[in-house]
Regions:
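Extracytoplasmic metal-acquisition and chelation regions
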Residues: 20-211
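Gram-negative bacterial Sec-dependent N-terminal signal peptides
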Residues: 2-21
Length: 211
């Protein structure tokens, strides 16, 4: 069974003692998650984005290059099956040896009830081409996620768009740093420092918006 289906706490337990000789290959499902992972990895490496910009995460067919990135990954960070149920099977098939983390299951994540008529479907991989300074905006700006298939939502009893909460984005930065540090202890200091800087950037953005 792929580790992607395990709760985050158990995945972390299984990960104990596992370290890679080089900087791990990392895959992220959508733009906002990519942006958070890229912020944590800044100066060390860069993740691969699984789904192209503007695609709906609810139904998607991987391009060959995206499937290869998933297959090559040592770690996979994705929102979870609530958002992309199809991706569970792809990870099971292509990345069965990867350590996959469903961020929506992370301790401290605030999950809301489904929101009717919400417009969330454009997932922009902020910073993919030029740095990653826009990741804080991914965490709170609903306008960056315009609808493409608003009438096709078939979510369960909770809203899978958890990255829109700045608090969740900050929680996930910590989770990402922890998982990367366990896989790559030599760069743990950089991962945690980057996560702290990312949290500070989000806090500053929220304060500016609320001012």
């Amino acid at each position: 069974m792929s580790r992607t289906l395990l709760p985050l706490s158990l995945t972390a337990t299984l990960m104990g003692g596992v370290a890679f000789a080089d900087v791990p290959r990392v895959a992220a499902d959508i733009g906002p998650v990519y942006s958070l992972v890229a912020r944590v990895m800044e100066g060390v490496g860069a993740p691969d984005l699984i789904m192209q910009q503007g695609a709906s995460p609810h139904e998607y067919s991987l391009r060959p290059s995206e499937a290869q990135a998933l297959q090559d990954a040592d770690l996979v960070f994705w929102v979870g099956a609530d958002l992309s149920p199809w991706l569970a099977g792809e990870i099971e098939t292509l990345a069965s040896d990867a350590l996959a983390t469903q961020l929506i299951e992370a301790v401290g994540t605030i999950v809301l009830e489904p929101r009717e008529g919400a417009l969330f479907e454009k997932h922009d991989p902020a910073g993919q081409d030029e740095g990653h300074d826009d990741h804080a905006e991914d965490a709170h700006d609903h306008d960056d996620h315009a609808a493409e298939d608003n009438d096709e939502h078939a979510h369960g009893k909770r809203d899978p768009h958890a990255w829109l909460s700045p608090n969740n984005a900050m929680t996930w930065l910590n989770v990402i740093a922890g998982q990367l540090s366990a896989a790559d202890p030599d760069n743990a200091g950089a991962y945690f420092a980057n996560a702290a800087a990312g949290r500070a950037e989000i806090e500053a953005t929220v304060a500016e918006v609320n001012a």
